[in-house]
Structures are given as C-alpha cells and as structure tokens.
Amino acid sequence: MSLAKRIIPCLDINGGRVVKGVNFIGLQDAGDPVEIARRYNDEGADEIVLLDITASYEQRGIMIEVVKNIAKEVFIPFSVGGGIRSLEDMSALLNAGCDKISINSAAIRNPQLIDESAKRFGSQCIVVAVDVKKVSQNSWNVYINGGRVDSGKDMLEWINEACARGAGEILLTSIDTDGTKGGYDKAMIEAVKSINVPIIASGGAGSMEDFADVFVHGADAALAASVFHYKEIEIKMLKTYLQDKGVPVRI
C-alpha cells in the first residue's frame, strides 16, 4: 500500500491566540490554540502546523508557552514556524515539545541555516516553507516576508537547493490561491512531483474535492486553515470521502 496521505490543519497564532484573516488582513480571533489543537487531535488530523504570524521577539516567550501547553494535550506530530532565525530559536521550540520546525524567509536569507539545522536536529525535523506566486505558464517565484517580497528565486531551483541542504519536507503555499477557497494550485504541485522529499500543499482548499484533486496531482499532504476552523469541512468526513475515492488515508 502506498504511504497514507496526510491532512494537516494550520493554526495562525498572534499573541497566543488563533487568528484567521484573508491574506493577513482583517484578522479575527478564532480561539484558544490549545483547545483547537486538541479538537483536531481528537477529530483525526494527522499533524498540526502552528504559524506564529507576529513572530516578534516580545511574542517569542508566549509562543514557547503555547507549544508547551499543546505538547501536553496533543499526541500527533506538530510543527512550528514563523520568525525562526537561529538554531537557538529551534532548540527552544523543540525542547518545549514540538516535533518539527518550519523555516521560510530565514532560509532564503541564510541557506546555510538548513544545513546547520538538519545536521544538529536531523532532516526529519526540518520543514522548509516556500511561498510562491506564478510568474508565467510553468514558472513560480519564491516570496518572503509573509509573501510580500519577491526573492527573485525560482521555485524549483530553490526547492532543489533546500532538499540538497537537508530539508526533510517542503511546505509549498500558493499565494495566488491562498484564502480563495477555489482549490489548490494543481499545476504548482505537478511541477514539483519529481522532488524526493514529501510535499505539503497549501493555499486554496475550499471543498473535499480540492483535497482529492491535490493528492491525485502528487501532494503527500494537504494543509488548510479556515475550512477546518469554521467546521465547513470535518476531518473525519473528509477522510471517509478520500478513502471512498481511493486515496490512502489513516482513518
């Protein structure tokens, strides 16, 4: 049997609370991260991603506390990203109880950070998050600083470099489809099919069909936020739907 496809809810955290906005604008409080993470754990999520979207230094201590509290309540793997700039940041979060670290802008600015972190903590702990915008028919550029700045790097070149340096997984977000609920960018996922580490697709989930589609196009895992937060899609029902469609999932 092929490896089970993973369903991963994402929690955007701001000042210790889960928030949700469209394209980072108009943030609404969506609840307590520990309660929401526990709910996803109970509903059958395979993993959880926590994204510290403020990620300023004064908030860092709050995030450590959130991670400690979630680690006590949640028994599925969870990763933490947002504003992680050093091995010390990673060490503090892993010691607080998370399983994986997600790095994004810091990895573009200092690619050596991927090598160093993979060497110290193991590739299985290191997720490189890549936010992209389409620039032509089959070409995407990598954006940093919360999707605001074009790094000038080509998606495929950067993902290949990140994997060569030791990334254990790629979290690939289409900025174009993010928050639209019109489906994942399937051409983007198709373009990275040959990459030999797991690819988590992100940006655009609006229906159960969208999940089935992105798995057919080669994603190893699918991440979503608002459709799960607001219970538009229940994870148990989604997994039953996927199983009926012949997608291997862990029930």
Curated annotation (Swiss-Prot):
Protein name as annotated: Imidazole glycerol phosphate synthase subunit HisF
Active site: residue positions: D12, D131
Organism taxonomic ancestry: Bacteria, Pseudomonadati, Campylobacterota, Epsilonproteobacteria, Campylobacterales
E.C. numbers: 4.3.2.10
Species: Helicobacter hepaticus (strain ATCC 51449 / 3B1)
InterPro entries: Aldolase_TIM (IPR013785), His_biosynth (IPR006062), HisF (IPR004651), IGPS_HisA/HisF (IPR050064), RibuloseP-bd_barrel (IPR011060)
GO terms classed as biological process: L-histidine biosynthetic process
Pathway where this protein functions: Amino-acid biosynthesis; L-histidine biosynthesis; L-histidine from 5-phospho-alpha-D-ribose 1-diphosphate: step 5/9
Cellular component, GO annotation: cytoplasm
Subunit structure: Heterodimer of HisH and HisF.
Gene: hisF
Gene3D superfamilies recorded: Aldolase class I
Pfam family, one: His_biosynth
Subcellular location(s) per record: Cytoplasm
